[in-house]
């Protein structure tokens, strides 16, 4: 009997501890900032693994930490808010966060790779890395950069898949043709709902990821991307749409309701566009083409020209102009 009573009270104590852990609490001032310390972390709508994924954040990305309940509610540089597991970011004071932002970085420029314990690709991996990951630059050794993670881990990153951030920015091209070339480099990467990395992308995540590889941040969702930059009502012959414009698809507007945006791609010219649906591939809006996409052609809405508006319009900027990176 006494044993049963003891077990009952143990159960109550565990339940109380569990409820306390789930209680949402504001973050203390000394840890209201943070930096992602895994290659790709998943943001969810709620603080639990069964909740839907809403977007992703990348290694080295600075974030604001808003609340805590065993998970962290964070805000990313594109102002997206979601919940991440406590094991994927390093909370920081404003002072440490500023130090991280000021430090020289190494940027991963290849779609995928690994960082190693030693300057030797046959040594133990420390983690995987993807394009756009940023790590603190600690030095160089042969064909490797010595780097450190936000959580203090040390590693070596091959110079063949990475570049010092300042050098990368100086050599970076942000013109239409360079951006389209990057989009083509992602051909065949699988579709992943809420994905924004080389591991997998959704339609707006493809746009977001391609541009981030050119140091450009734009709104996360297609429904947000559709209303920045210059709106273009597409001519029947597509003569007013340029390579690099974004083309949007969805439910057409009626007298009773506004259009509904549900898909986006990057226009390539000649009625061709690259997009993520199943995987990243090129489709056509010309019925005579072998890759004709009847489904999306019938729900084509309009185009947006965005490149001339980077750093000139709210929500579209390079990282050196984004307040999260300052």
Regions flagged by a language model, labelled:
Residues 183, 195-214:
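Active-site nucleophilic cysteine motif
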Residues 51-54, 123-126, 173-177, 197-202:
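Soluble non-cytosolic domains of exported or imported proteins
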Residues 218-282, 288:
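...with weaker cross-activation on analogous glycine-rich loops/strands in unrelated enzymes
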Residues 121-123, 163, 260-326:
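Aromatic- and glycine-rich peptidoglycan recognition patches
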Residues 22-31, 62, 76-110, 120, ...:
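Boundary regions of SH3-family modules and the immediately adjacent low-complexity/disordered segments
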């Amino acid at each position: 009997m006494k044993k049963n009573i003891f077990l009952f009270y143990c159960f109550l104590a565990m339940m109380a501890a569990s409820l306390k852990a789930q209680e949402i609490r504001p973050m203390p001032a000394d840890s209201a900032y943070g930096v992602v310390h895994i290659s790709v972390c998943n943001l969810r709508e709620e603080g639990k693994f069964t909740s839907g994924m809403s977007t992703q954040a990348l290694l080295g990305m600075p974030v604001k930490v808003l609340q805590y309940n065993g998970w962290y509610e964070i805000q990313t540089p594109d102002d997206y808010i979601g919940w991440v597991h406590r094991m994927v970011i390093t909370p920081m004071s404003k002072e440490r966060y500023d130090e991280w932002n000021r430090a020289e970085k190494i940027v991963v420029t290849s779609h995928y790779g690994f960082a190693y314990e030693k300057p030797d690709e046959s040594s133990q991996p420390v983690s995987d890395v993807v394009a756009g990951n940023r790590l603190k630059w600690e030095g160089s050794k042969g064909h490797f950069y010595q780097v450190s993670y936000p959580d203090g881990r040390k590693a070596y990153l091959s110079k063949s898949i990475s570049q010092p951030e300042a050098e990368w920015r100086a050599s970076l091209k942000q013109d239409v043709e360079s951006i389209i070339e990057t989009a083509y480099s992602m051909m065949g990467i699988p579709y992943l709902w809420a994905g924004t990395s080389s591991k997998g992308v959704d339609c707006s995540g493809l746009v977001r990821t391609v541009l981030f590889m050119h140091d450009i941040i734009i709104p996360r969702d297609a429904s947000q991307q559709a209303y920045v930059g210059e709106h273009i009502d597409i001519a029947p012959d597509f003569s007013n749409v340029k390579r690099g414009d974004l083309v949007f698809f969805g439910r057409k507007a009626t007298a009773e309701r506004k259009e509904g945006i549900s898909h986006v791609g990057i226009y390539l010219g000649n009625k061709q566009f690259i997009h993520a649906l199943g995987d990243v591939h090129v489709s056509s809006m010309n019925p005579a083409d072998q890759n004709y996409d009847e489904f999306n052609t019938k729900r084509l809405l309009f185009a947006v020209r965005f490149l001339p508006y980077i750093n000139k319009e709210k929500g579209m900027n390079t990282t050196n102009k984004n307040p999260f990176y300052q």
